[in-house]
Structures are given as C-alpha cells and as structure tokens.
Amino acid sequence: MQTPAPVEYSRATSVDDVIEKLVSLDGKARILAGGHSLIPMMKLRLANPGHLIDINPLESELSYVREEGDEIRIGAMTRHKDLLDSELLQRVFPNIFEEAEWVLADPVVRNRGTIGGSLCQADPAEDLSGVITALHGKAVVKGPDGERVVDMHEFHLGPYMTVVQGTEMVTEVRFEKGPGQHGSAHEKVERRAGDFAIVAASAALWLEGGSIARVGLACSAVGPTTIQMTRAEEMMVGKEPSDELFAEAGKISTEDCEPGSDGRGPADYKRAVAGVLSKRALIRAWTRARGETLPRHSHWHPQA
C-alpha cells in the first residue's frame, strides 16, 4: 500500500494556533514540517493521523540560528541546509554540524527537512540527535500549559518515541556555548552515502588550562535511542587529554552501548565500532580544540 489513508489538512498561522488545533483535535493530529519522514510512513500506513497541521507558514517564527547571551538557539523549523550554511554555528561549534549534515540523506532531504522534525522522528540511527546530545543541547517543548525545557538525553523515550505529548510541539533547540577552547567532530559508518548510520559517534570538548573543562560524547544506532556516554564523560572531565584517555573513553562506549543485530550488522560488530568511532571523534575534537585544522571527515562505507 503506497497511498495514505484519508486525512484532514490545515495550515497553521502561529505557534499558539498549532497548540489550539492540537488541543481541539484531542492530540490526534500530526505536525507536518519537511514531511520526509512522516509522509512515507503515511503511505505505508505506519502512521495514520486523522489531521495534518502544516507549520511551513511559520518559518518566519520558527526558522533561525541566533546567539542569545551564553546560548545558541535554533528554531525548530530551521532546515538542514540552513544549519549547514550557518556562519554562527561554524564559529561557535565548528565542524560538528557540518560533518553531520553532509552525510545526512541527500540534498532533497536537506533542503526540506528540519531540525525539529529530525528530533521528533526519534530514529535511533539519525545523525543530528547525536550531535545535539554531545553538545548537551536542550529542546523547548510548548503546549497548552506553557513551555518546558528538556535535556536531549531525556528527550527520546525509545524508537520513534519522545516526551512530546499529543498537544505539544518542539519550538526550539538550545545549547550553552561552553568555556575555553572548543573542538568537535562527528564520525559515521554507513552502508552507502546518505544512509542511516550503522554506528555514529559525536564528540565535543572544551579545554581550559590544558585540561578538559567539559566534554560531550554520544553514540547513535547502538541502542533504542541515541546514547549519551555519561560514564565516559565523567571519567574525562578535569584530566589532560591524550590518546590513552580517549582510548579508555572508547572502551567505556563499547561497554555502555546497547546494540542489536539487524540488517546493518551484528551486535558485536556495532559495539566494537562504537568504541573505535568514539575514540576517533574525541581525538579529532581535541585536535581542533588545539587550533589545528582538519578536513571534513570522509565517512567509511563497509563495501568500499
């Protein structure tokens, strides 16, 4: 079956209008942004909303990348191509968004897909969730009772499940800029260019006085959600960076991930790759934090 079930459609005029519509429809509506995940699921009858609320008219309200005090804020309707082209993101968080966006699907998806849509789709193998988790990002969720701010490591409940209720929507993603010298990187193993990850790792660190003042490490496609490697992060904070330290962090990643065997590979393989990519991403982030320039990573395809 490649035809969606009958569905009602309306265009939103504001965020408040979206919330009102969601409430009036008793949470049975779905929000339509880029549509590259939702529409295929509707065609396969894996998603059968009774009503679609199109938020594309809200780009002027929800599409932005801006700096506010010690935070970077990204509107939920900001498209992947705009994240890739953002000079502000390249200045504050150089490389990590670029490396993730270049391997996210293809230009058609990047031109239409949005950061909010990617997060709410909650695919465990999705690239941006790892980036946002490594940067210790937070999602702003708005509903009839007001706004709440959710840490990214608490945002996803399982595959295709989030904390966002049927009468709520994501409006923004926020990041603290962090102290000292910063470096970050995104590593990915995929079957072919633009595919979902077999395994991916995102790392970000901040150096002060030669030691790690803050660090984020996340792995995707090795569990029911993107996994923040909290134990590895805590082990690294306050220590001087080194290849040996990052090798230990990679070992912890292999222990703390929860991969399953599927068409992309056996669990033991994914576990080993998570450790290798974690170490590699941390070393590249450290190199960049020292001010050295590295080219955008050429991601590895097993069949090559």
Put a short name on every predicted segment.
Residues 1-304:
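C-terminal structural segment of proteins
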